[in-house]
Amino acid sequence: MDALLQVSVDGFRFENGSGSCCKPRNNLESGNNLFPDFHESQNQSSPNDSPPTVCLDNSPVLKYINDMLMDEEDFVGISRDDLALQAAERSFYEIIQQQSPESDQNTSSSSDQNSGDQDFCFPSTTTDSSALVSSGESQRKYRHRNDEEDDLENNRRNKQPAIFVSEMEELAVKLEHVLLVCKTNQEEEEERTVITKQSTPNRAGRAKGSSNKSKTHKTNTVDLRSLLTQCAQAVASFDQRRATDKLKEIRAHSSSNGDGTQRLAFYFAEALEARITGNISPPVSNPFPSSTTSMVDILKAYKLFVHTCPIYVTDYFAANKSIYELAMKATKLHIVDFGVLYGFQWPCLLRALSKRPGGPPMLRVTGIELPQAGFRPSDRVEETGRRLKRFCDQFNVPFEFNFIAKKWETITLDELMINPGETTVVNCIHRLQYTPDETVSLDSPRDTVLKLFRDINPDLFVFAEINGMYNSPFFMTRFREALFHYSSLFDMFDTTIHAEDEYKNRSLLERELLVRDAMSVISCEGAERFARPETYKQWRVRILRAGFKPATISKQIMKEAKEIVRKRYHRDFVIDSDNNWMLQGWKGRVIYAFSCWKPAEKFTNNNLNI
């Protein structure tokens, strides 16, 4: 555990093309281990115990997620939730100090059930309760307070730490399967059994465990999709009175806690109302999760998504496997990741590179993100770099991380520091749709970014994106296509998420993953509309025009990806190939597409065609 918490940052360089840099923080050197048994077992194993492969077990991701949670505990970020966390911690330590002035004795008595070498220790709920109840000695030191103040103080002491600790304990359990990219064979078989039981349809055509039967009758009596279309037509024709009447009718038959159709209608009605009033609350200006959403909740929602939907799992698997095959003989590997965000894609690849015959290559990652609002536009990507660095140190992978936080179309080739002796990979997964196209600017920032990809002259360009047709400049055309697209997604979550205790996470997932984009598509116009998807055939034309040619996805990768979907997920998920694209969808509708590309003409150092 000490090795995970006290990692040297020597040789860890941060370089930001936008000019804002930060130094590694020292307060990440200590924290609380949420997976103690896991780390002990991992420290006893050797990286050479098994042959090199990609995504065989979930230990890399568990380490990575545990690291993120410790960062959440120990580091005061710019988000409001981080400040609230730190306030809760300060209150917790104030309580302990108030219980006894002799901190050494209190520490020794309260650490019988915990590790003594932890700088920030969050005891179990039982320990908290006993310590807080048996506080008579400390209470005698505050007899100048009246009885009412003592009661309020006791309530504060008893409630706040228990809530915080129980939340972290619950999160530790739920995050064990946060990514299904890496699984052991035994875990695969167990997961397959669970999914098979959950996916068996009943006579109503829904999976077992669904609790929305009581709401089906109401949905069948009112055609909510038709009402939404009529409301959108009224909005498009500026008939505010008719649009308001339709909105009232939709709200009477929709709910954020109903079945898939009811939830779709509820959120689309909110988007239509925002378009009418011009008031979007909360404001939607970028694809990032809301600043009021904590990292804890984001991880819970992400865990639920990868547990019920294979999109990210198979795309990350295919991307990592393709990069690994390219890097089998490379001595230096440079990955330029456009849209690195939290870095969930990389733990399994790093683990595989550590087991490569002959040792791992020198790995350099350039993480690129859009700037955050506030005084620290690069804060998120810097934190991702620190976590990846500590993770690489665990597996002895030589690592260097550079970051850039600025609009992608403004990035220059010099900022990326491409070295001729490196094997270079450009990675862009599910993020290019958020770059404006020619309908916003005649120069087409989207084509500018693709041209930058080509100027990098990569050995491999890994690309995945949403297959969507709701990017029309005409509102009604865009609305109808968005209605079809999101109907499939809400139906997918409605079918695959059964447990009632997951409904809260489903609501968060839909709000942050689906509703933000839908709100942008429906309520915004011009440059304010940040979600601009295209079909995979349209992406193909753009990428070919930028100077790339398709790279064949190996049959082995396609076979293993299909096995992942078949064994772990609902039978209505589909995966197929078309003209060097790996396509994924739900009930026959293609939703996501993945492909690999290479430069049509490879350039030498002197920019000569070869």
UniProtKB/Swiss-Prot annotation:
Gene Ontology molecular function: any one: DNA-binding transcription factor activity
Residue span, GRAS domain: 215-598
Segments of this protein annotated with the region Leucine repeat II (LRII): 383-415
Residue segments, region SAW: 523-598
Biased composition (Polar residues): 123-137, 209-220
Record's signal peptide: none
Localization annotation: Nucleus
Annotated tissue distribution: Highly expressed in roots and at lower levels in leaves and sepals. Expressed in siliques.
Annotated function: Probable transcription factor involved in plant development.
Protein name: Scarecrow-like protein 11
The species this protein was found in: Arabidopsis thaliana (Mouse-ear cress)
